[in-house]
Amino acid sequence: MELTARKLLTIAHERALEGALVRDIENLGAHGYTITGARGKGSHGIRDATWAPDANIRLEVLCGADTARAICTALRERYSDNYSMVMYVGDVDVLRPEKF
């Protein structure tokens, strides 16, 4: 079994940004993504996913290091001043690297 190194970029953000972020990450080279609901507590207080305007979602992208870096840089520049957003990148090993 051959494993290949990739990056897992996770972005927790306001649900209102979903469409714009999906367009951005695809334009920046992401081949796909996974979106799930998210709730929790952070510097902007408690976020509860039950009320749509106040909901957060988590967007995950498996990609190469250059793509992860490009996405993080672009999203930080475009959104971090006006929206709640947390991004982090971790190392992962994947099967079928051509998918990512």
Predicted regions and their residues:
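Positively charged, small/polar-rich N-terminal and surface patches that mediate targeting and assembly
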Residues: 1-100
